[in-house]
Amino acid sequence: MNLYFLFFISTILAAKPFNSFNKTSLIDEGVDNDDDIVSKRAVVIDYCDTRHPNNLCKKYFEIDSYWNDDTDCFTNIGCKVYGGFDIIGGKAPKIGTVCRLKKGKNKFGYCNSKGNCVERDFIESFGVSIKIKGISHRGDDEPACPLYENTWINYGKCNEPYHCGTNYGLFYANKRKLNYFPDNGQKCNSKYEIYGVCYLGRCHGTGNFSNGEVFSEFGTIFKDVEIVTLSDGKNSSKRGKHKNLHGSKVFDSNGIYDIDPKNWKIEDDDKDITVHENAGDPKSDSRRC
């Protein structure tokens, strides 16, 4: 009984109080041995991943999204209680998460529903749009590229009309040649628009080439990119249903799959509408950049 009491007290002392937790994104810097490029990898610790099958992962637990093996789609996004006790049980593939196709190679794909890391197929659409406007802080783990500035795009169609990509494979947009990746700093489109990509829960971008910026492995972290879901949740190619906050707007993915994205965009009177998910709803994902 005394031993149990001592263990209980030590556990309480080891735990950090929630209100003292610093909600920041940690950056781990390392050197890429292939081409001596300094890489940065974000570790999300500011929210819990409600997509995880462990429903005990609530606000009092912190997220550690750092993969030991980013080729393994069955690696958990760890949900840990303050004090470091790992309460995760079982493993599940993070469908749609960016993953490394082969160890030691800077070429990336996505995790499919079978847990395999595969190259992106442009027949599929994962139902996420991106808008370069507004402020939000949580992200999805999938690549995206904008078609027109300040408009919603379906990145399953982002190969039209641009061929956008990076030499690290975080942007796939050349349907005819999937292994096409520009060199560092190579222009991705004629308008020099900023591209955004969410990776490991934070939103990254390639930079604005008109200002002389260049590609980096995961890009520059952006906080002004919003994600909206376009999915019906019926299969791995479409993200799950989400309840949106009052006043927000969401699109039905089934209604846009066969529409050329250059033919649809936000109407003028809707440009300032903030579209996001209800992170407070346990049935809703909290994927926002």
Curated annotation (Swiss-Prot):
Keywords: Disulfide bond, Neurotoxin, Secreted, Signal, Toxin. Residues 1-14 form the signal peptide. GO terms for molecular function: toxin activity. GO terms for cellular component: extracellular region. Residues 270-289 are annotated as: Disordered. Disulfide bonds: none annotated. Posterior glands which appear to be connected with the stylet through a series of ducts. Contains several disulfide bonds. This is Toxin tox21A.
